[in-house]
């Protein structure tokens, strides 16, 4: 869902073939707009010329890439993105992402450093909850940090299971 500001700005936009347009995405956990945890602001390319941009081959968090230099234009307003209905839904999606990430590492023949194997999940929680201020999102911030811990732990578990 886009807000009124973004709708008006898109309506008045004169697109250019040498530009990409980024928009701010407000992610929700249930009905709660996550303001911290590194999730907001979250500027992403949402309008682009498909003749000069393409998606990379990542299984998780695909990115747009281009062989030519493009101007990045911010469009004010925001997109409301209801990623997770609740914590149970988040766990299901994160488990899926963990399996994909492990498969991606395997395909690339990349092995996580030993320190990541033992400390990665703990650091992920610490980074999300404290460094990225998830603590200020209250219960939602703790839920996200806890699930980030399990995501990293499961990525590593699935990677080493498949070896």
Question: Where do the PLM segments sit?
Answer:
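Catalytic-site signature of metal-activated, phosphate-bearing donor transferases
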Residues: 3-163
């Amino acid at each position: 869902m886009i807000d009124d500001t973004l709708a008006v700005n898109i309506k008045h936009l004169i697109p250019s073939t040498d530009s990409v347009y980024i928009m701010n995405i407000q992610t929700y956990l249930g009905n709660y707009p996550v303001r911290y945890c590194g999730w907001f602001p979250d500027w992403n390319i949402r309008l682009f010329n498909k003749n000069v941009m393409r998606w990379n081959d990542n299984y998780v968090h695909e990115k747009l890439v281009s062989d030519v230099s493009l101007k990045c234009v911010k469009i004010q307003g925001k997109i409301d993105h209801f990623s997770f209905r609740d914590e149970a839904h988040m766990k299901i999606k994160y488990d899926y992402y963990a399996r994909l990430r492990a498969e991606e590492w395997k395909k690339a023949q990349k092995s996580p450093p030993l320190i990541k194997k033992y400390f990665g999940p703990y650091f992920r929680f610490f980074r999300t909850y404290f460094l990225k201020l998830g603590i200020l999102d209250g219960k939602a911030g703790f839920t996200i940090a806890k699930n980030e811990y399990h995501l990293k732990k499961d990525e590593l578990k699935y990677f080493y299971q498949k070896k």
